[in-house]
UniProtKB/Swiss-Prot annotation:
Any single biological process term in GO: RNA processing
Pro residues compositional bias, start-end: 711-721
InterPro entries for this protein: ExoRNase_PH_dom1, ExoRNase_PH_dom2, ExoRNase_PH_dom2_sf, KH_dom, KH_dom_type_1, KH_dom_type_1_sf, NA-bd_OB-fold, PNPase
Organism of derivation: Prochlorococcus marinus (strain MIT 9215)
Name of this protein: Polyribonucleotide nucleotidyltransferase
Name of the gene: pnp
Binding site for Mg(2+): 495, 501
Length: 721
């Protein structure tokens, strides 16, 4: 078997492409490699069997643990349902690919990116996105590409192209920019309160690199003798569109100009116009061309009516500067917010509403053992902040079965999660695991940004000391030729009929998250820059409204939330605290009715609903880890008697033995003649043997019964910060 190999030098690295060797029955396939990261990306097109009114595109990213030399956990030792990371990368591929296929295409297209080997220095996601474009081009599928994606990081004052996982963690920015020859088609970003100007410069920096990869793909096609199939729009039958424009335009335009009506009223009126039009068509003669067309395809009137509505709404915005609800282009809908709306058995809660979009967010405080373990190819092993987003059917007035979260819900949850992470307190000052759940109670656009706002409010209500509140809004776009209008705080119909959905979240200082999706084949950086700048005053307005509901963390936690104590011990003494088979730590938890977690670095977290119990457990652990020195004197309690001596607890959880010969200056026949179990005695540390056992003596030590334990002094270690 022989394939064709090509190397691309990009940012000082070699990207290796192998074509014509793998997956020969796919329409197009490429093995794309950089460092030790290898992905097989395939694109397959089949003829659609049933008529539909959308592009049936499926993008799947799959990762197998063998790519990192690991065997899956669980009884079956086999990968099961795709992890959240795989779902998010699948969306990352889909979002820039979808607008680059012609709107009229109805053939089934599936893109599969399989991670076969993973190098932690080379994240696989952006390679998968670029590989999807290459596989589609090689498969000679109509496509407005090439398309490529890069990641941009920021360390200090320097932008870094395609940083490693470690560099991403250290930096203040993680942004993925995808683009086509026409401009940028997708942005996904998380940032540490980055200024608008720095964010714009990062996007510009990323798109410059994207153009290099686009040129490399064009060169690859030339080298292989493959001619790209540029989509050519089929001739459209104007019969039905002309009929609808003549008979419906005036009525639709009147509905769109009723600025004081509700969404439900507008939808009902538009549906009424469509139904009446359908009845008129049905009454036409059997040989009428319009009736023949609609009888052959029942969905045709629906799609053409939607196109006409879209055209009229866009014209109203472009020409009149008015939106369907009467707002100015830069106007935010009415906002209401409240915190603490649920009983305190829920640790934190809030309700955020913007227009008809309403989100209920709740916060739960958990212990370190509640962290989510990550069984995927992500180098991070656990998550301590979780955001779950739910979108029930009643939120849009529909009925359908309630299923597990879909890709959209996972993606929106991840976006809101990313927006909040930069302002969370460090685990040293607030060691709780946090779970926020956002329930979308009503949806009319920008529910993910509503979830960001609701998350902030519920976290503050739970007493979480955020560095700053985070708010967000969705920006939209209407572009007709050179006429461009940017919309602030888009609602559902503007998202559905517009060209862009650009979500911007952040604090009053800067941006924490971005997500931009397009319905056109690309936008220049200048227009994206305008959208980012116009999002700032809207965000500040939203933050001001949020702070009217709650402007600082609650001073006390819910009485039903666990109490945590966190401190550090010498990592070398972790084994002492755990004990053989976990007996020691189990004994402490049972004695104090607490929950104890110890990290590899020596950070101990004690959870309890009783603060005194947590303090008792801390005292025991500090006693266990306190180093005892020869010559020290302790007041302790006799815990056990054996024929050759007595065991004395000198510190909580730490015992030493007094040999029978060390009980008195005089000869002792029986241990019980001098001490009994439960006696308080004063002892001196005689020696600590090579095995760490503490030998004590009563000889030469004046007894002072009733003396309490000395305050334990923890072993000196590095401070938490």
């Amino acid at each position: 078997m022989e394939g064709q190999n090509k190397s691309i030098t990009f940012d000082g690295r070699e990207i290796r492409l192998t074509t014509g060797l793998y997956a020969p029955q796919a329409s197009g396939s490429v093995m794309i490699e950089c460092g030790d990261t290898s992905l097989l990306v395939t694109a397959t097109k089949t003829t659609k069997k049933e008529a539909s009114d959308f592009l049936p595109l499926i993008c799947d990213y799959e990762e197998k643990l063998y790519a990192a030399g690991r065997i899956p956990g669980g009884f079956m030792r086999r990968e099961g349902r795709p992890p959240e990371r795989a779902t998010l990368i699948s969306r990352l591929i889909d979002r820039p690919m979808r607008p680059l296929f012609p709107t009229w295409m109805r053939d089934e297209i599936q893109i599969v990116a399989s991670c076969l080997s993973l190098d932690e220095r080379v994240p696989a996601d952006v390679l998968a996105v670029t590989g999807a474009s290459i596989a589609t081009l090689l498969g000679e599928i109509p496509f407005y590409g090439p398309m490529a994606a890069v990641r941009v990081g920021l360390i200090g004052d320097d932008f870094i192209l395609n940083p490693s996982y470690r560099e991403i963690e250290k930096g203040d920015l993680d942004i993925v920019v995808a683009g086509s020859p026409d401009g940028i088609v997708m942005i996904e970003a998380g940032a540490n309160q980055l200024s608008e100007q720095d964010t714009i410069e990062a996007i510009d920096f990323g798109y410059e690199a994207v153009t290099e990869l686009i040129k490399s793909q064009e060169d690859l096609l030339k080298d292989l003798g493959i001619k790209q199939i540029k989509p050519s729009d089929p001739e459209e039958d104007k019969t039905l569109p002309s009929y609808l424009e003549k008979n419906c335009s005036k009525a639709i335009d009147l509905v769109l100009k009723k600025f004081d009506q509700s969404k439900e009223e507008r939808d009902l009126e538009l549906e009424k116009i469509k139904t009446e039009t359908q009845s008129k068509i049905d009454s036409l003669k059997d040989d009428n061309e319009v009736r023949v067309l609609t009888s052959e395809n029942e969905k045709l009137i629906h799609s053409d009516f939607k196109k006409l509505t879209k055209k009229l709404m866009r014209s109203q915005i472009i020409n009149d500067g008015k939106r369907v609800d009467g707002r100015e282009l830069d106007e935010v809908r009415k906002i209401t917010a409240s915190a603490g709306i649920l009983p305190k058995r829920v640790h934190g809660s809030a309700l955020f509403q913007r227009g008809l979009t309403q989100v209920l967010s709740t916060t739960t405080l958990g212990t370190p053992s509640d962290a989510q373990e990550m069984d995927d190819l992500n180098p991070s092993t656990e998550k301590t902040y979780l955001h779950h987003y739910n979108f029930p059917p009643y939120s849009v007035g529909e009925t359908r079965p309630m299923r597990t979260p879909g890709r959209r819900e996972i993606g929106h949850g991840a976006l809101a999660e990313r927006a909040i992470i930069p302002v969370l307190p460090g685990k040293e000052t607030f060691p709780y695991v946090l779970r926020v759940v956002s329930e979308v109670l009503s949806s009319n656009g920008s529910t993910s940004m509503g979830s960001v706002c609701g998350s902030t409010l519920s976290l503050l209500d739970a007493g979480v000391p955020l560095k700053a509140p985070v708010g967000g809004t969705a920006m939209g776009l209407i572009k007709e030729g050179k006429d461009v209008r940017i919309l602030t705080d888009i609602q559902g119909i503007e998202d559905f009929l517009g060209d862009m959905d650009f979500k911007v979240a952040g604090t009053n200082k800067g941006i924490t998250a971005l997500q931009m999706d397009m319905k056109i084949t690309g936008l220049p950086v200048s227009i994206i820059s305008d959208a980012i700048k116009k999002a700032r005053p809207a965000r500040l307005h939203i933050l001001e409204k949020m702070q009217e509901a709650i402007d600082k963390p609650q001073e006390s936690l819910s009485p039903h939330a666990p109490r945590l104590l966190s401190f550090r011990i010498d990592p070398e003494l972790i084994g002492t605290v755990i004990g053989p088979g976990g007996r020691t730590i189990k004994g402490i938890t049972e004695r104090t009715n607490t929950k104890i977690d110890i990290e590899d670095g020596g950070i101990v977290t004690i959870a309890s609903h009783d603060g005194a119990a947590a303090e008792e457990a801390q005292k025991i652990i500090e006693g266990l880890t306190r180093k005892v020195h020869e010559g020290e004197i302790f007041s302790g309690v006799v815990t056990r008697i054996i024929p050759i001596g007595a065991f004395v607890e000198i510190l909580p959880g730490k015992e030493g033995m007094v040999h029978i010969s060390q009980l008195s200056e005089a000869r002792v026949e029986r241990v019980e003649d001098v001490v009994r179990q439960g006696d308080e005695v004063t002892v001196r540390v005689r020696e600590i043997d090579s095995r760490g056992r503490i030998n004590l003596t009563l000889r030469g030590v004046g007894q002072n019964n009733g003396m309490s334990y000395p305050e334990p002094t923890p072993t000196p270690v590095a401070p938490l910060n």
